[in-house]
Structures are given as structure tokens and as C-alpha cells.
Amino acid sequence: MKVIVLGGGVLGVSTAWYLAKAGCQVTVLERQDGVALETSFGNAGQISPGYSAPWAAPGIPLKGLKWMFQRHAPLAITPDGSLYQLQWIAKMLANCNEKAYAVNKGRMMRLAEYSRDKIKELRAETGLQYEGRQGGTLQLLRSQAQVEGMAKDIAVLRECGVDFNVLDPDGCARVEPALAAVKHKLAGGLQLPNDETGDCNLFTSRLAELARDKGVEFRFGVTVDGIENDGKRITGVRIGDELLRADHYVVAMGSYSRDMVKELGIDIPVYPVKGYSLTVPITNPDGAPTSTILDETYKVAITRFDNRIRVGGMAELSGYNLELNPRRRETLEMVVGDLYPNGGDIKAASFWTGLRPMTPDGTPIIGGTRFANLSLNTGHGTLGWTMCAGSGKVLADIITGAKPEISVDGLSMQRYAKQGETLVVPVIRPAVQGA
């Protein structure tokens, strides 16, 4: 089977890898000059199944209103001039209830736990190195109210069989020794010892090299001008005057997936949620984190790579705007400087932004479409790195007719059809004869 994958981020490359392992002839099309140069380039570095939860949660509407008036708020909304932004926010708010949260979190954790296992399997099989660590995640709680508010999350972790440790400030310092100097600022912590970390860009680049060894072709610097169809099947992908044909097609273009498939009559509810990161050179290893922490107050993650600290966070709804907002840098600098003041040269840090493809319910969209030979792998939000291997393997199984190793219930576009979403009629774009 010949498959064309649109998108060379961590999801596209992971999908290509598993398809190639299944015996498919795979071509990856990417507009940048290499893999993982957009959203997969500078993320927070966390592989955190236990923290796989939708942003659409009970209490978020009220918190969102409060955050609007805070300087270092984790969420910001800037009107992008589109009706779609308002519609997407409305759908997200509709998921901010206990019932929807439980269903969505269950789906996300199922996929995330599986994906972590697949990454471990991949590491054992190939020896892939990407500055990975298996030291767990430590969620830092700065107030007693946050400690008490962990009860619901702990109940979910227990129900899902996720290992965890509840810590006091001294316990936090034992897990992350550099926090000893600032433990007076903490009320407690929640550790998930089975979480992992790593450089997503490095992982994707090296996995792409392994994929090439299995015959995957990568074409960089190409722009997909359109997807041709006959109303029932995809007949080719148009790149300038060239029409590329395959037996199956996968769209894994992150936040840009929606525009690519909209002309086909597929309206996927994915919105670009802007995130930021700093990459700080380490100057004092003893003053840096050993694994990764998540500051619950500011929703900022601080992760240790070999000689760097990655500080990532924020959620800004402002469309496809990729401008670097200096106020977001101030927030990231403030958080890492508050917790790890002696770990690295913060002023020498590089500043980055990327667009996470988010669905209103938090669950990604993985699976087929109304076209028999077109599949989607997008909408992972802040968890693309956490869910990449599992998502790639699940979709490869679906495409090749193998039985997925986990339940795929609720992962495809079908869940929106069940909610009464309307889909527009596809525009039929027949292939040019002789192309």
C-alpha cells in the first residue's frame, strides 16, 4: 500500500514510522526544510500521561474570567476577527462539566498511557536517544486551596491505576533537590513517577532517520495546493503542476489540518492555541531540575534536558498569529527564576512560540473520514509529544486493517457527528486528465 502523509511534525513522522513498519510505501510532505520545525520544535518536553486532561474542565469558565485580569495568567484570548473562534470557544465551554470532563479525560489517558508504552518499546527496539529522562513529573502546589483541590484529580488517577505520590514541601525537595531553597513557597506537590521527558524535536529528527532506513521518502519545502477527489475517494495531492497519487492519504498538519480538509467538506473543530517556551542554558547543574515540574498556579512546565532547561506554557487564543509577545517571556522568566534562580542563564534563553492544534473536548481526532482513503491525525493540543507514538500506531493499524491494541472509541470525527455536528458538502475536484 502506498501512503502519503501530509505533515512532518512528531505526529506525521510517528505515523509514517508505523506505516513503514507495517510494510507500506510512505511519502511525507512537509512545507518546512526539515521535520519538527513548527509546533514540535520547542514544546515543554513532557511525556505526561497522568496529566492528560482537557482544558475544558469544571471551573474553567470562572477561572478564565479571573485570569483575564492577571498579569501572569496562563490563558489569554485575543479576538482574531473570525466567527469560528467564538464558535470554538462556545463548544469548549459546553464541555466544561463533570460528565464531559470524565469522558474526555478517560479517552485522553487511555491513549496517552498507551503512547508512553509505545515510546518505551520504540526506545528498546531502536536505541533511540533524544535527551530523554524517566524521572517522573512533579506538580507544584503553592497554596492550601490547591492541595485540597487535588482530591478530584487523585481520585481519577487512582481509578485509572496511575501511580502517584502526595508530597509535602520537604518531599518536593527530596524529589527535586534544587527546590530546597524555595520550599517555603510551596504547600505541597503531586508526583507521577512514571512520566518521562525528552526533546521532541530531537526525537522526531532521529525517528525520521530511522524511517528513511525503512524506505520512507521525505519531501521538504513543498506546499500542498489542494487535495483532489471524486466525491468518494481522494484521487491525488496537488503540488504545483504535479499530482501525487497514493492508495491512502493522511492529514497530520497540526493547526493547519482544518483548512486543508475544509474544501473536502470535512469541518474538523481544531483551533490553534498559541504556546510559548524558553530554552535556558544550564550554568549550575545542581540548581536545575532533575526531571520536570509543573507549576499549578501558572500552568508552566520546567523540564531538564542534558545541558538546557525548557520552560513552556501559556495558552493564547489569537488565531494563527506567530508574533512573540514579550509579556509571555516575562511570565516564563518569572516562574523559572522564582523556582530555579541559580540553574541557568535566563537572559541568554531563546524564546519560541508555536500553535497547538486543540479540539473543544481535548481529545485528538484520529481515524478515517467520509472518504474511504483519507485519515486524520490531529487535534492533540498540548499533548502531541505525549500521544505521538500511540496515535501513530493506532492510525497505522486502522489504515492497514490490523486490530488496534487499545479501544479507539471516541477518537475519530464520528464523535462530533453523534453530537449533531453538520458537515458541508464536499467540493469535487477531479484530477486533471493526463496528470
Curated annotation (Swiss-Prot):
It is an enzyme of class 1 (oxidoreductase). It catalyses: a D-alpha-amino acid + A + H2O = a 2-oxocarboxylate + AH2 + NH4(+). GO terms for molecular function: D-amino-acid dehydrogenase activity. The gene is dadA. Its cofactor is FAD. Pathway: Amino-acid degradation; D-alanine degradation; NH(3) and pyruvate from D-alanine: step 1/1. It comes from Chromobacterium violaceum (strain ATCC 12472 / DSM 30191 / JCM 1249 / CCUG 213 / NBRC 12614 / NCIMB 9131 / NCTC 9757 / MK). Oxidative deamination of D-amino acids. Gene3D superfamilies: D-Amino Acid Oxidase, subunit A, domain 2, FAD/NAD(P)-binding domain. This is D-amino acid dehydrogenase. The keyword Transferase does not apply.
